[in-house]
Structure formats: C-alpha cells, structure tokens
Amino acid sequence: KDRVRGFPTLYLHQSVGQDLEDGAEANGFKFEYYGPDQDTVVAGLNGGIFADVGPVPNGEPFQKMEVVRAAFNRVKAQVRVFSFSFGYADVREDDREAVQAEYQKLVAEVEAAGVRFLHVTPPIVYSPEENPPKQAMREWMLATFADAVIFDLQDIESLDGGARCEVGGVWRICEANRSTEACPSKGQGIDGDGAGHLCEAKAAEFAKALLYSVYQVSR
C-alpha cells in the first residue's frame, strides 16, 4: 500500500477509467486530479480524463495519443509509472493496426525516458458485434508486450463467477459487471448495449486489480 501511495503514477483515461478511479477511491486509494497543461504530479496516484486533459472525445485514438505524449513530456522527470487506456469507441477494425503501431511507438518513448509503462487492455461493451476489434487489440497487446505488466481489464469484466460472458466466441461485458439500474456506475449513468461502463460495486472490485498492477510495475 505504501508503495502505491508513494510511487508517482499518472493514468490517463476516459469514462471507464473514471469508473476505476472511483473504485480505487472506494478502496481508500484516491487518484489526485491531473488537468489540462499540468506539469506536476504528486507522489502516489494521479489521474486525468481525456475530455478534460485534451480535451479530446472518444473515437479519436490518434488525438488521444498526442494528448498522452504531450502530458508525458510535461511530467516525465517526475513520474515513475505512466499509463493510459483507450475507450471502447477508440478501437475499430478499420484503423486498429495503425493505432497499435502508434501505441507501440509511444510505449517505446516512455520506456526510453526511464519510466515504467502499465498497459491496460481496451474495455468491451455489452453488444458483442462491436467487440472483435477490441479482443484483437487485447491479443496483440498480450503477444507484443508479453514480458510487461498488463492490467487485463477486458478479461476480468467479461467474467462472472469464473464463467466467460460471450456470444459465438465473442466476449462481452457481463450483465453483472455493467452499469444497470440494479447497479449503476457511480458517475456514468445507465448503459445501453453499445456502452461498457462499470457497476459501482464491480468497479471497486476491479480497481483492486488495477492497484495491484500499479504495485507490480513499480517493483
């Protein structure tokens, strides 16, 4: 716990990442706010949302990576662990390979500066037809960065009681894990089938795995 609270870490994300931030806070680990053009981070966890830090909307992965690059260059002398996650709208088949190539370049830049990078697999949604590109990116991440620490969000959000939630071999976020009227996201509202926000209780559970990944990469 002391290591996670003391190791300067910056995590940039969109709304599913905000669910995880809220979940971490429920476990006693608050992310300090990181905002636009900010050039400082505090010891421990720092978090920023792309809609604010950019601002850049979902569905613009290359713009997001430029925001990530600019933020990293502002704080690279201070931060020890750096991470960002795509939103579910950022990963499409038509430009997935180009996004992956730019992501790999960005990771290399972070590591060349002596900073540790924490990978996060892209979130999936409830509607299975939208998820194959996201699964393909996950598989690429696991193969390309096999020796790195990867927070496999996609894996855990598509499991319920050890059973995989899938349709015809395509994973989906489980009904028990998604934001519904029975268990809404803390801040993102009730989801339609094309979204993938996290039930507040599940976000707190999944955030433990995120925090453990931060610990692992900081060792």
Regions from the language model: what does each represent?
Residues Y11, D19, G23-A26, V67, ...:
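Extracytoplasmic/secreted proteins, especially bacterial periplasmic and envelope-associated proteins
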Residues W171-R219:
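Histidine-centered active-site loop/cap adjacent to the catalytic His
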Residues D22, A26-V68, Q154, A163-G187:
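Divalent cation-coordinating acidic motifs and surrounding scaffolds
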Residues P122-G162:
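Substrate-gating cap/lid alpha-helix
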Residues K1-Y33, G192-G196, L211-R219:
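N-terminal module-boundary/linker segments of secreted carbohydrate-active enzymes
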Residues D19-L20, D90-V99, Y126-P132, S158-A163:
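Extracytoplasmic/secreted cell-surface and envelope-processing proteins
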Residues P61-Q100, P122-V125:
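Oxyanion-hole/transition-state-stabilizing segment in secreted/luminal serine hydrolases
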Residues P8-L12, F31-V42, F50-D52, R80-F86, ...:
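Structural recognition of the beta-strand scaffold that forms the well-ordered cores
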